[in-house]
């Protein structure tokens, strides 16, 4: 089983997390921010990882620190659960529709962190109490700590809730593909360099 647990305590947040990459998509998430909890539940459900998360943050200021730090811890936990990455597919790609919204997510579990987060020129609407900039901060924290290459592009959309949901579900499906074990590649790294 590929599982891990991580903890992060700062002056702004206190986060404990356990995850199983080879789960069934069960989530028990409590961040104090209902919309963010909903997004994390979707991420667990669609990636099929089991996720237990308790987070306390300075939500009286805003959700930024909580969202960013949860992304940091989730990235660390997934990286730890992946271990040496032998046998993984490594790459994942998802086009995720959510009603009028379409988002493309491409991931490479390369050990080379990079994030591209793009939205259409002119901007997009925010979800209630969850600005689109928080989606970007989450992606950046996740990718930098998972040490993956992550490209997220919201191709179009009109509803802020649908846009955020398509981003989180898109990440889930790309991660599910990239982290999957390919039995034909058992015991080998998906790299001609011999390392990731």
Curated annotation (Swiss-Prot):
Domain of life: Bacteria
Subcellular location, record wording: Cytoplasm
Pfam families assigned: IGPD (PF00475)
GO molecular function, one term: imidazoleglycerol-phosphate dehydratase activity
Reactions the enzyme catalyzes: D-erythro-1-(imidazol-4-yl)glycerol 3-phosphate = 3-(imidazol-4-yl)-2-oxopropyl phosphate + H2O
GO biological process, one term: L-histidine biosynthetic process
Main subcellular localisation: cytoplasm
GO annotation, cellular component aspect: cytoplasm
UniProt enzyme class: lyase
Pathway given in the UniProt record: Amino-acid biosynthesis; L-histidine biosynthesis; L-histidine from 5-phospho-alpha-D-ribose 1-diphosphate: step 6/9
InterPro entries: IGPD_sf, ImidazoleglycerolP_deHydtase, ImidazoleglycerP_deHydtase_CS, Ribosomal_Su5_D2-typ_SF
Record has Transcription as a keyword: no
Family per record: Belongs to the imidazoleglycerol-phosphate dehydratase family.
The name this protein goes by in its record: Imidazoleglycerol-phosphate dehydratase
Origin species: Akkermansia muciniphila (strain ATCC BAA-835 / DSM 22959 / JCM 33894 / BCRC 81048 / CCUG 64013 / CIP 107961 / Muc)
Taxonomic classification: Bacteria, Pseudomonadati, Verrucomicrobiota, Verrucomicrobiia, Verrucomicrobiales
Gene responsible for this protein: hisB
């Amino acid at each position: 089983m590929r599982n891990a647990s991580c903890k992060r305590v700062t002056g702004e947040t206190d986060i404990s997390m356990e995850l199983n990459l080879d789960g069934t998509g069960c989530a028990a998430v409590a961040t104090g921010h209902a919309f963010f909890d909903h997004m994390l539940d979707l991420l667990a459900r669609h990636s099929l990882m089991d996720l237990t998360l308790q987070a306390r943050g300075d939500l009286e200021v805003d959700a930024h620190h909580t969202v960013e730090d949860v992304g940091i811890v989730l990235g660390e936990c997934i990286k730890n659960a992946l271990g040496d990455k032998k046998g993984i597919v490594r790459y994942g790609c998802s086009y995720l529709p959510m009603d009028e919204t379409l988002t493309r997510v491409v991931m490479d579990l390369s050990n080379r962190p990079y994030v591209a987060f793009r939205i259409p020129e002119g901007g997009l609407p925010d979800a209630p109490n969850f600005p689109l900039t928080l989606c970007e901060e989450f992606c950046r924290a996740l990718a930098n700590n998972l040490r993956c290459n992550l490209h997220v592009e919201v191709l179009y959309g009109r509803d802020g809730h649908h846009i955020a949901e398509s981003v989180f579900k898109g990440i889930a499906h790309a991660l599910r593909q990239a982290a999957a074990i390919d039995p034909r590649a058992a015991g080998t790294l998906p790299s001609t360099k011999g390392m990731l």
